[in-house]
Amino acid sequence: LKNGIAKEYLFEGSYKMSQLDWQVENVILVGFDLDFELKNLYFGCNFSYGLYNFDGKMEDYDWLNMLSSDYTHYSCHNLSLSKDLDFSIDIGLMFPLEETGKNYVNLFAQYNFKNTMFEAKNGYYRYKEYGKISEGELSGLVITYNPIIESFLLGFGGNFYISKTFSFKSETAISLLSRGVCTDNHLLTKDIWKDAVFGKVFLKSKLEFAFDFGDRFSMIFGGNVENLPMLQGQTYINGYPSRNNTGGFSSFFYDFYFSYRIRIF
């Protein structure tokens, strides 16, 4: 199950004009891990896909009055995910701590690719302009948001056996570079906003516990935490670069999972 929030920003210079909070709750994920070891060298890939989002909402804030810190426009919508893909490839080195090689520390490099499609539907709005307040309800698909982010990371970790059948594994990685393209489609105004964003600090951590059943089978319970601070870059409006605006993206997600591991050889 996956939970968390992605935030979309629009700036004019250093002034924040807009922020959209895309909040997901209890997304069901399916996926797999494949790992191959050759002595102390290993290769791995991970794939996950979001099947269903039980609950979620999107909140849209605008600050159109630069003389006030209060937001002038607000809307709230139901959120659903039509796509949530996460793929990574690892290459690393293991350093055994004893003869069996079951206890080890490791260093690795990783490429990570994410492609998510958020959809905001129905909801209501409350706008304040020139001292007047207008309110109303919205129906149907209002906004879609598609951040596509790729990151290059370096990390370290280790695997440690507490008993003959019970072990835990921990890994932490930080990005050297993150970049992406985030596309916002406002269906009511028929405007498409696209941000080409860049940044460096992306932190990922994983902790999992494994129960072995013989030499080849394990049951695993684990969790991941990912924190991506602000990525920022050029904004394009309906295909044309904006002279005054820049866009931004940030996210924080965590998930818990059960899996079954089979060692083939």
Predicted regions and their residues:
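Extracellular/periplasm-exposed beta-strand and loop segments of Gram-negative cell-envelope proteins
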Residues: N3-V27, Y49-F87, F113-I149, S175-K206, ...
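Short loop/turn motifs that connect adjacent beta-strands in outer-membrane beta-barrel proteins
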Residues: D35-F43, F95-V105, I162-F168, F213-S218, ...
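Short gly/pro-enriched beta-turn/loop segments at secondary-structure junctions
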Residues: K102, P147-L153, Y161-K169, F202
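Outer-membrane beta-barrel architecture
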Residues: G31-D35, D90-M94, G155-G157, K204-E208, ...
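Transmembrane beta-barrel strands of outer-membrane/channel proteins
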Residues: L1-N3, F36, C45-L51, L93, ...
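A structural/positional concept
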Residues: S82-D90, Y104, F156
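Extended, basic/helix-rich recognition subdomains
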Residues: G180, A210, S218-G222, M230
